[in-house]
């Protein structure tokens, strides 16, 4: 009976491990993150132009300028994962 339970657990673990392999292809590699170009923005005001970006902190920012404002205020290091909402 114990062998059967262990065999079922091992089979279930192997199946879940396969699903991890298939989802790895959907993950974004760190080398693909884009560094925001914060030098091109005039502070302390950003335009209201909506062009969402997804930061590496998994927050969506209204545009690259608002992400740069967050970096400037907090001193945090946030890159851009993609040019659309998270």
Swiss-Prot record:
In terms of InterPro entries, this protein maps to: Kazal_dom, Kazal_dom_sf, SPINK2
Q: Which GO terms describe its cellular component?
A: acrosomal vesicle; cytoplasm; extracellular region; neuron projection
Tell me which residues are marked as the site Reactive bond. 48-49
* Location of the protein in the cell: Secreted; Cytoplasmic vesicle, Secretory vesicle, Acrosome
Q: Any idea where the Kazal-like domain is?
A: 32-86
GO biological process terms, alphabetically, are:
acrosome assembly; fertilization; male germ cell proliferation; male gonad development; positive regulation of apoptotic process; seminiferous tubule development; spermatid development; spermatogenesis
Recorded GO MF terms: serine-type endopeptidase inhibitor activity
Cross-referenced SUPFAM superfamilies, in alphabetical order? Kazal-type serine protease inhibitors (SSF100895)
User: What name does the UniProt record give this protein?
Assistant: Serine protease inhibitor Kazal-type 2
In its UniProt entry, the species of origin is given as Rattus norvegicus (Rat)
Gene designation per UniProt: Spink2
């Amino acid at each position: 009976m114990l062998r059967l339970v262990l065999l079922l657990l091992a089979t279930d673990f192997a199946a879940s491990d396969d699903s991890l392999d298939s989802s790895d292809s959907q993950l974004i590699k760190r080398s693909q993150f884009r560094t925001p170009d914060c030098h091109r923005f005039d502070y302390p005001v950003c335009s209201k132009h909506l062009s969402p970006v997804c930061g590496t902190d998994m927050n969506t920012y209204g545009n690259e300028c608002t992400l740069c404002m967050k970096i400037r205020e907090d001193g945090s290091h946030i890159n851009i994962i993609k040019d659309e909402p998270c």
